[in-house]
Amino acid sequence: MNTWFLNVVDPLHQWFLGFGDIGVVLWTVLKILMIAIPLIVSVAFYVVWERKLIGWMHVRHGPMYVGMGLFQAFADVFKLLFKEVLYPSKAHKVIFVIAPLLTLAPSFAAWAVVPFDTKLVLSNANVGLLYLLAMTSLGVYGIILAGWASNSKYAFLGAMRSAAQVVSYEIAMGFALVGVMIAAGSLNLSQIVMAQAGSSGFFDWFLIPLFPLFIVYWVSGVAETNRSPFDVVEGESEIVAGHMVEYSGSVFALFFLAEYANMILVSFLISIFFLGGWLSPIQGWVSGQVSPLIDWVWNGGWPWLLLKVLFFASAYIWFRASFPRYRYDQIMRLGWKVFIPLTIVWIAVTALMVFSGVIQKGV
């Protein structure tokens, strides 16, 4: 399915390499833009999808104007860009502006090692898993600085909640990925996907043997992105908007962009680690070549990855529309007393499954 794309990209790559070192730099910048621009556009349409889907769940219409609601998010962005950025009188203005950038940067930098297909990846790093853990844990520093620089008790309280929540669930997420690493025998994300390939389709995915780790990673991902029902960081009924309470205009839009970019990132990572990434759920069930379209259905490709991502991204919206917010003590109890012990136990179970040959791909 990605052959046509590679046929276009490869000649373009060779053309850039003809310019020497400057060509390598330009090609790298182009690859970054090929990820960043679609990501920003995806966030805009994701916001529209969220408003539409929640509207349908609540028996409402959702956005209906500005291109039948399709371009409502773009209108909101333009509105925010032209709004004045207000600074609290006692705020630290430099850190106040830098904080949303520190939150946004890791959410974009993490995409450097995320593969979309066998050859569609910006950097096929062998330590991609460690890189992801580092990048996804950096965003909280921007939130903490935003709460401190705002000089507001509501913002500071939201920032402290975020710090405690990230510390609690980052451990569980890391332990869940240790199980994935043991099962795949690699820290390379492309190799983790290919470790789930086989002739049994979705039965070869890590979803089945690592199901408890899948649940832990999914729920922890929701908590890491501060989304409902774990949105105590910006609980409107308690602390107004948390660390974002003093923000307006374009700097507020940066926080908004970082949050939704992280949601899409977590949806990608769940699909890669547990659902075989771009692999087809019926891969290996049919042999032989029939047609390019039918061959793609059982051989897999990046559209399969996008379908899986759409499911998990929509699940975020379903959670928001369906579940009430947890109390802060309930969130802490779930992270420390349930998820961390469960992941530790299942790491040992995963090692036993690899040792006994139940999982064939681990080394």
Curated annotation (Swiss-Prot):
Chief location of this protein within or outside the cell: membrane
PROSITE patterns: COMPLEX1_ND1_2 (PS00668)
Membrane topology, record value: Multi-pass membrane protein
EC numbers, comma separated: 7.1.1.-
Catalysed reaction, written as an equation: a quinone + NADH + 5 H(+)(in) = a quinol + NAD(+) + 4 H(+)(out)
UniProt KW Transmembrane keyword: yes
Transmembrane segments: 29-49, 62-82, 94-114, 127-147, 166-186, 202-222, 239-257, 264-286, 293-313, 339-359
Subcellular location: Cell inner membrane
GO biological process, one term: aerobic respiration
Keyword set includes DNA-binding: no
InterPro entries: NADH_UbQ_OxRdtase_su1/FPO (IPR001694), NADH_UbQ_OxRdtase_su1_CS (IPR018086)
Cellular component, GO annotation: plasma membrane
Keyword terms, alphabetized: Cell inner membrane, Cell membrane, Membrane, NAD, Quinone, Translocase, Transmembrane, Transmembrane helix, Ubiquinone
GO molecular function: NADH dehydrogenase activity; oxidoreductase activity, acting on NAD(P)H, quinone or similar compound as acceptor; quinone binding
Cited HAMAP family: NDH1_NuoH
Family (UniProt): Belongs to the complex I subunit 1 family.
UniProt xrefs under NCBIfam families: PRK06076.1-2 (NF004741), PRK06076.1-3 (NF004742)
Known role: NDH-1 shuttles electrons from NADH, via FMN and iron-sulfur (Fe-S) centers, to quinones in the respiratory chain. The immediate electron acceptor for the enzyme in this species is believed to be ubiquinone. Couples the redox reaction to proton translocation (for every two electrons transferred, four hydrogen ions are translocated across the cytoplasmic membrane), and thus conserves the redox energy in a proton gradient. This subunit may bind ubiquinone.
Subunit structure and binding partners: NDH-1 is composed of 14 different subunits. Subunits NuoA, H, J, K, L, M, N constitute the membrane sector of the complex.
Protein name in UniProt: NADH-quinone oxidoreductase subunit H
Gene: nuoH
